[in-house]
Design a protein with these regions (language model features):
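Short amphipathic recognition helices of helix-turn-helix/homeodomain-type DNA-binding modules
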Residues: 51-54, 58-100
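Short, charged amphipathic recognition helices of the HTH superfamily
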Residues: 18-25, 49-50, 80
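Hydrophobic protein-protein interaction segments
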Residues: 102-308
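A short, Lys/Arg-rich alpha-helix, primarily the initiator
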Residues: 1-22
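Short alpha-helical "recognition helix" segments of helix-turn-helix
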Residues: 22-29, 56
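Recognition helix of helix-turn-helix/homeodomain-like DNA-binding domains
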Residues: 31-48, 55, 72-73
Length: 310
């Protein structure tokens, strides 16, 4: 084994050992076979495609800086704007498995959600605010400016993923329902308790963007609830005849958080485990019972959201 092969082998071996995922999970998320990953670990592949390296790095939960390190070890240039489509394409190959898959970093979490959102089917969102993909262009870059400052690609990458998620949302609404459940107190605090003037303007635009979707798409059902859910989660339910299992993405958002400052924090989990999904369906049953009936009237709902965002 040459020195260069040894470096590649050691880098991949260390990354695999640090990963909380099994080999099968890494293969499922990256779209690479176990056999290919074993050859990478041995340093036995002389010319590894850039796209495969990035997909592998995403599955390993590497930060953007760590992905740069991997690319350099494999004699590739650091990440650049031209690589953004590769991250988007990685969401097409990624598969969510029955194991509980931990996800670190906002951009990796977004890719996991996008991979689920690409599957046609009914969509449930339980959160304290409108769907994150409805944030205006530039909001992510501001709210996560510390991460944007840490890596030159970060802001453009998360905005590009957000655009693709909005595109998938619109496409899905053509044939399937999207049901969002939002705690009215959390949503009110999201706007009124924000002390950062610029962030508040971004949040107001976020709510107005939700109003535009509610006004334009009958299949977008937005419910205000009295109860604050235990978890924030997204559930995708493909048609029964599709043969595709339901997908679940879980996260917890600290109510006081304004700026995301640290890379590497646990962002959430993804799974298609039936038993886990059944528990969240039971949670959804309780959430439905707390829907505020006054705002089932679509115009009253819109009026409330417009007033809140002014």
């Amino acid at each position: 084994m040459t020195t260069r092969q040894q470096m590649k082998s050691e880098f991949v071996g260390t990354a695999l050992k640090k990963s909380p995922l099994s080999r099968n999970q890494i293969a499922a998320v990256s779209g690479l076979s176990n056999a290919y990953i074993r050859e990478l670990e041995k340093g036995g592949i002389g010319n590894v495609g850039r796209e495969k390296l990035i997909a592998f790095a995403i599955a390993l939960n590497l930060s953007l800086t760590e992905i740069d390190d991997m690319l350099r070890v494999f004699d590739r240039a650091a990440l650049a704007e031209d690589d953004i489509p590769v991250f988007i394409q990685a969401s097409e190959r990624s598969r969510i498995s029955a194991a509980l898959h931990p996800i670190r970093d906002s951009f990796t979490f977004d890719i996991a959600i996008l991979s689920a959102e690409r599957i046609p089917g009914d969509h449930v969102i339980v959160s304290p605010r409108p769907a994150s993909c409805l944030r205006a262009e530039g909001h992510r870059a501001y709210a996560e400016k510390s991460l944007a400052a840490a890596h030159r690609l970060y802001a453009d990458l998360v905005e590009a993923i957000n655009r693709e998620r909005r595109k998938q949302l619109m496409a899905n609404l053509a044939d399937h329902a999207v049901r969002q459940f939002v705690c009215i107190n959390c949503l009110t605090d999201y706007i009124r308790e924000c002390t950062d003037a610029e962030e508040k303007r971004w949040r107001q635009r976020h709510v107005r963007n939700a109003v535009n979707i509610i006004s334009s798409f009958e299949r977008y059902e937005f419910y205000l609830t009295r109860e604050c859910p235990s978890f924030i989660f997204v559930m995708r339910t493909p048609p029964p005849d599709s043969g595709i299992s339901e997908k679940l993405i879980i996260t917890v958002l600290p109510p006081h958080r304004l700026q995301v400052r640290t890379s590497g924090l646990l962002a959430g989990f993804a799974t298609d485990n039936h038993a886990v999904i059944l528990n969240f369906k039971e949670e959804l049953t309780f959430i439905r019972e707390s829907i505020i009936e006054d705002y089932l009237d679509r115009q009253k709902l819109i009026d409330f959201l417009v007033e809140l965002s002014d």
